[in-house]
Amino acid sequence: MRLSHVILGEILYYDPEFEKEVDKIVDLGGKHLGSGDYGSAYLLNGRVYKVTTDEIELEHAEILKGKKTNNFARIYEVEVINPKLGIIQMEVLGEFRGEIPDEWVENVNREAEQHGIDPDELDIRPSNIMVNQKK
């Protein structure tokens, strides 16, 4: 068993449910893409599977699931295991490099509001921005 930590606020703890979900994806051949404050992302069958403990992210993913948007990753499926653990299946995007244009942030905030998402709940920072490599 691998030991990993999930960071929630300032508390580090081992979450066996999180590890169980990660292990399922890895056992199916998922390739680790990266980890952040609240989860880890894996590439499997041409999609990104993100295991997250961020309940707000899960709520946003549920709202965006199946919708075509201009500024958010396409969400195919959302599996909520419990309010603080879930798996989001989304499109594969490329890494963003550079500065975040103010106009883009304004567009994201506007689109979030159109979908009923509070823009103040968005975590806009370079490490959370991905780009569509096909465009």
Task: Label the predicted regions.
Residues 114-132:
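Catalytic-loop of the protein kinase fold
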Residues 8-31:
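Juxta-kinase regulatory segment immediately upstream of eukaryotic protein kinase catalytic domains
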Residues 102-120:
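A generic "structured core" feature
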Residues 1-9:
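Short acidic, low-complexity intrinsically disordered linear motifs used
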Residues 43-46, 92, 132:
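Active-site beta-strand termini and strand-to-loop segments that position acidic
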Residues 29-66:
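ATP-binding glycine-rich loop module of kinase domains
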Residues 70-108:
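Conserved structural core of kinase catalytic domains
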